[in-house]
Amino acid sequence: MSARTILLRSSTPSLLLLASLCALAVPKDKEPAPHFSAITTTGEKFTNDSIKGKVALLEFWTTWCGFCADEASFVDKIGHELAPKGLILLAIDVGESKKTVKKYLDLHPRNCKIVFMEDTNLAAMYAATSYPIYVVIDRDGNIAGTQRGAGGEDALRRLLARAGLDLPDDDSDSN
């Protein structure tokens, strides 16, 4: 038996246990959102208390994620379009240095509030390990829904509607 086979067989139970524990820790729909604090690149601070009465869209992304880059333009568009209806969009970069993110944003600007992972505990709370991940928190501070992976604009709009956001009737230009 090769060393690789032995390693795989011996580590599999540990990995399964770790995955199970992570799954148990992830907040579920209709549960209260975990207490958090996030500071944007412009110095704005967001907490559970500061978003009460609004709908929050937490977008977990990275600079190397192709799906994140593909979806960024419509995510930003939705964030801007629905801000007057009470939507707060926080784009949380996961696992990269501020220098890396700033360099990326110089080349690929975003029209939303950017949060560095090192300035928040949100990524750990939502077991952000694949990207993008979208989490919607409703006006009462509960998880309205979560989407792991790219799903397109229509899927994101449906997720936001679950939080009670009054979406415009005309979304004919959505993907």
Language model features: what each stretch is:
Residues 34, 47, 61, 88-90, ...:
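Conserved Rossmann-like nucleotide-binding pocket used by diverse enzymes
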Residues 2-15:
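Bacterial N-terminal signal peptides that target proteins for export
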Residues 8, 19-35, 166-175:
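N-proximal helix/coil linker or "cap" segments that precede and/or mark the start of modular domains
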Residues 104-111, 117-161:
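Thiol/disulfide oxidoreductase modules built on the thioredoxin-like
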Residues 36-56:
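A short beta-strand-turn-helix
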Residues 69-108, 118-125:
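Structural microenvironment flanking redox-active thiols in thiol-disulfide oxidoreductases
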Residues 57-58, 89, 134:
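Hydrophobic beta-strand anchors of alpha/beta hydrolase catalytic cores
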Residues 54-56, 61-64, 130:
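Short pre-active-site segment immediately N-terminal to redox-active cysteine/selenocysteine motifs
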